[in-house]
Swiss-Prot record:
Recorded name of the encoding gene: htpG
Example of a GO MF term: ATP binding
Matching Gene3D superfamilies: 3.30.230.80, 3.40.50.11260, Heat shock protein 90, C-terminal domain (1.20.120.790), Histidine kinase-like ATPase, C-terminal domain (3.30.565.10)
Role noted for this protein: Molecular chaperone. Has ATPase activity.
Name of this protein: Chaperone protein HtpG
Native source species: Methylobacterium nodulans (strain LMG 21967 / CNCM I-2342 / ORS 2060)
């Protein structure tokens, strides 16, 4: 053994770290290549920055990171022409965690001008040790720029490392991984290329891969989000969007900006013009990609709330360490501040684009149901989201907003009225709406699945309470019908008590209705309880016990109700008719009769009696 070989024990913290990295820290084994490529690319950036003040550090003309798999030798080599490391650097950066090359280098940049700063440097620190997930021995041969000496650091990750003199013709670093028996896949060029494309496609330093004896490009090499907007064409944005999302449409909106000051990040976000093939309703989490200094970290950082999960893109920050784990991300306040800033930017863009009614309508039809989830989930943004949602209406064609509705309210109208159901056309012809239409009162029609929930969290807009018209408490006496009322109103003094007794197990009340014009009956929700659509959802989910009983409302001017009132007054048995009347109300509201067989029998009997 060479007399110049030096043996050193890892610092105590490294042994613990190795075990953590190999067994717990990283969610995917392929992360090792991301870390090593990032280190190599950052070393190139570091040398490039140093050359600004020391021409002797100038990079070679074609500076690139080279990846060379060797199946015969079972090695994977990552080489770079970067700043390199000397003997002390290797010991300090790879033998302990106490010293951090990145932190030391960051201090030297503290007073540099922004346009002089390269990306903050990923260092041979925590991320480096991920190599031991796939390698049973790692050798790092490095020559520092400006020095003639090269050294090799080597370890099997079992508690010690060695340092020995080496030779390297040019400054830079070679990391050689002796692969474990179960890591054959990482010697396959196509597998390596896939990983590089996934994790490092937009690192600005070129990356090449040795495949079939030839060097091929491994990455695109341009972080589009870091380029000035003026230098990017719409075609380039669209191409990047399609590459990133695997969609084939043109983005409905492109947001590209850089934040500087308290937060330092670049963002390039897209709102698709079409709903993806896999509906966004099925995926609950935002998939905006988090990059740190151009290196992809994760698409599970929650950079946007779930109600903006249709937004795609990249956020690249310099305020996080490159080797931050997904587990650590959730605990850092930096990410929370970025999330708030990005969310505010997207909402601002939507507000601006909402001024173009036709253009906004296309967005709304694709992603409106998802955006409305925010009213239920996000108290902080609830009012802003309320201004962005759109509705069908009983009074106007196309889409309308809360603000538009308020501008059309009748002089003595105090509330915003909504009707929730499964189908807009059915809602527009619903018996629930007859009295409102007769009085010229507009009703907003809500038919998305989420519409049964969010109105519980938004009780008013612009100071106007929001009320479901299926609630029985609405008083329309202040509004005179705009047309002549047809038919004389029946006296229900005898009918109502009898119906209450007959239907006591099925309804909570029976009363005359102000809102019926053409229909004989309708069901409404009792005051203070869930509206009818929520009751339907509870029943469908097997939770009918929480739905409560409806109120049966009667139209005293309808011929059927007048006839029943006469029969009740003369003492006739109206039990069968009462049951049929209630089932008619269910059918009219879009529900099935309580007992379809019994309902059919009663209807057949009634028809036969008329024949």
């Amino acid at each position: 053994m060479s007399e110049t070989l030096e043996r050193h024990a890892f610092g105590a913290e490294v042994g613990r770290l190795l075990d953590l990295v190999v067994h717990a820290l990283y969610s995917e084994r392929e992360i090792f290549l991301r870390e090593l490529v990032a280190n190599a690319a950052d070393a190139v950036d570091r040398r490039r920055f140093g050359a600004l003040t020391d021409p002797a550090l100038a990079l070679p003309a074609e500076a690139k990171v080279r990846i060379r798999p060797d199946k015969a030798a079972r090695t994977l080599t990552i080489s770079d022409p970067g700043i390199g490391m000397g003997k002390e650097d290797l010991a300090q950066n790879l033998g302990t965690i106490a010293r951090s090359g990145t932190r030391a280098f960051s201090q030297s940049l503290a007073e540099a001008k922004p346009d002089e700063r390269p990306s903050l440097i990923g260092q041979f620190g925590v991320g480096f040790y991920s190599a031991f997930m796939v390698a049973d021995r790692v050798e790092v041969t490095s020559r520092r720029a400006g020095s003639d000496e090269a050294w090799t650091w080597a370890s099997d990750g079992e508690g010690e490392y060695t340092l020995s003199p080496a030779t390297r013709e040019e400054p830079g670093t070679d990391v050689v991984l002796h692969m474990k028996a179960d890591a054959d896949e990482y010697l396959e060029p196509l597998r390596i290329e896939t990983i590089v494309r996934k994790w490092a496609d937009h690192i600005t330093v070129p990356i090449t891969l040795l495949r079939d004896g030839e060097e091929v490009s491994g990455n695109e090499g341009t972080a589009l989000w870091r380029k000035p907007k003026a230098e990017i064409t719409e075609e380039t944005y669209t191409a990047f969007y399609r590459h990133l999302t695997h969609n084939f449409d043109t983005p409905w909106a492109t947001l590209h900006w850089r934040a500087e000051g308290a937060l330092d990040f670049s963002a390039l976000l897209f709102i698709p013009s079409m709903k993806p093939f896999l509906a966004v309703e099925e995926e609950r989490e935002s998939k905006v990609r988090l990059h740190v200094r151009r290196m992809f970290i994760t698409d599970e950082a929650g950079l946007l709330p779930s109600w903006l999960r249709f937004v795609q893109g990249v956020v690249d920050t310099e305020d996080l360490p490159l080797n931050v784990s997904r587990e650590m991300l959730q605990a850092t306040p930096v990410l929370a501040r970025i999330r708030r800033a990005v969310t505010a930017k997207v909402l601002s863009e939507l507000k601006s684009r909402a001024k173009d009614a036709d253009g906004y309508a296309s967005f709304w039809q694709a992603f409106g149901p998802v955006l409305k989830e925010g009213i239920w989930e996000d108290a902080e943004q609830r009012d802003d989201i309320a201004g962005l949602i759109r509705f069908r209406s009983s009074a106007v064609e196309g889409w309308t907003s809360f603000a538009d509705y308020v501008s059309r309210m009748k002089p003595n109208q105090e509330a915003i009225y909504i009707l929730v159901g499964d189908d807009t056309k059915a809602l527009a012809s619903s018996a629930q709406i007859e009295g409102f239409r007769a009085r010229g009162i507009e009703v907003l029609l809500l038919s998305d699945h989420v519409d049964a929930f969010w109105p519980e969290r938004l009780d008013k807009f612009d100071g106007k309470p929001i009320r479901s018209i299926t609630q029985s408490a609405d008083d329309l006496s202040a509004f005179a019908p705009e047309g002549e009322s047809e038919g004389e109103a029946a006296d229900l003094a005898d009918l109502v008590p009898k119906l209450k007794e007959i239907l006591k197990d099925d309804v909570t009340d029976v009363r005359a209705s102000q809102r019926l014009v053409e229909s004989a009956v309708l069901l409404s929700a009792s005051s203070g309880g869930p509206d009818l659509q929520m009751q339907r959802l509870l029943r469908r989910a097997g939770r009918g016990f929480g739905a409560g009983l409806p109120v049966l409302e009667l139209n005293p001017r309808h011929a059927l109700v007048r006839r029943l009132a006469e029969r009740a007054k003369t003492g006739e048995d109206i039990a069968e008719a009462a049951q049929t009347l209630l089932d008619l109300a269910h059918v009219q509201g879009g529900d099935a009769p309580r007992d379809p067989v019994a309902f059919a029998r009663r209807v057949a009997t009634a028809l036969a009696a008329q024949g």
